[in-house]
Amino acid sequence: MKRINYLAIAVLSALLMWSVSDFTELRPNPAQAGAPTEIRGVWLTNVDSSVLFSDQAVTATLQQLADRHFNTVYPAVWSWGYTLYPSQVAEQAMGYQQGLYPDLEEQGRNEALEAAQGDRDLLLGLVAQAHERHLSVIPWFEFGFMLPANAPLAQRHPDWLTQKQGALPVARRYQEGRHPRVWLNPFHPEVQAFILDLIAELMANYDVDGLQFDDHFALPVAFGYDPYTINLYRQAHGGQSPSTNPYDAEWTRWRAAQITDFLDSVFRVVKAQRPNAVLSVAPNPAAFAYRESLQDWPRWREMGYIEELIVQVYRDSVDNFRNTLRDRTIQQAQGHIPTGVGILTGLKNQPVPIGLIQQQVQVARDMGFAGVSFFFYDTVWTVANGETWRDRDRAIQQLFAQPRERSQL
């Protein structure tokens, strides 16, 4: 496909302006000294939520968050196989500039709803309104390398997909929730170029404060058995094929290292376009992330690629929550970069009691973490049994009684 020159410009600029060693020096976390700071974030998604579907909803959402002394929003900008902003890169790759509504049913893309958006640029308006309210905006690549199985990108570029062992098409399928998914191959140069071009375009066109990946900037350990990746592995191992055991130590190490190498390119592109932008990662705890998703985020931190870490600690008891935060890799990160805690405030039809949320925030504070982020916006105010909306709102106001600047490097 015809390529936009965002990536070439970004990488050239990065090579001229930085070496990675400039960023890898271990630095103390400034959240531990000086004026009080705290990450007070919330994820904004287009799944089970309508907050991104109109300018009026965006305005009301941001005003509510600012009034309650939040300081950071993580809006989804890459979800369900589409960008949530007009993208030339996406249009060239899949034929669509953007897609705000997830393809939740078998009929696929809802063209009527998308057409009703007209020429609206969600992200442009959101960034402007957030900054007016002193909210930082760190766009969130929610789906990472994951796509719905029926996504236009997957249909147009089947060679970009990786697979498990077995016969196609079943070997490409991955079930998360009730919707079948597929995975872009993070080791394929055309996939990497597509993702880097999206990032360069985003950083060049929007006054954002950073970029965030989560547990989907990864690959389920069962994947990687496509012909391209097998041949790549053989080239690096004297003709030897990867183990049929997906958990094999060398096979796991090699795939994780390739993802780490790609994050180096991501970091350079971000910094070339927007030097002060924060590269944020919101993974699962390290042992699980590496074993099941080939994410070696402690290594990413050591290499200086991560400038903010929000570990997803979605636990239904305070003791489990506290014990997870005692993990050595989390403690090491806490002493190096702003490290916050992702707290689950609820899922669709599964509200989390506000008392548990309050306790978890307090544990994170007592243990010296740089802040918290709630998943996700709508459920912050979704009542659990025995609660009222006013109960939850009052609790949030008490948690964030005074405004705070974000913790940052």
Regions found by a protein language model. Give the residues of each.
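An active-site-proximal structural segment forming one wall of the substrate-binding cleft
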Residues: 63-70, 126-130, 160, 183-218
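Glycoside hydrolase catalytic-domain groove-lining segments
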Residues: 234-350
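Catalytic domains of carbohydrate-active enzymes, especially glycoside hydrolases
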Residues: 57-83, 205-210, 305-306, 366-371
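Aromatic-lined carbohydrate-binding/catalytic grooves of carbohydrate-active enzymes
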Residues: 70-118
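Substrate-binding cleft of secreted/luminal carbohydrate-active enzymes
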Residues: 306-321, 328, 335-409
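Aromatic- and acidic-residue-enriched segments that line the glycan-binding/catalytic groove
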Residues: 85-99, 145-176, 215-243
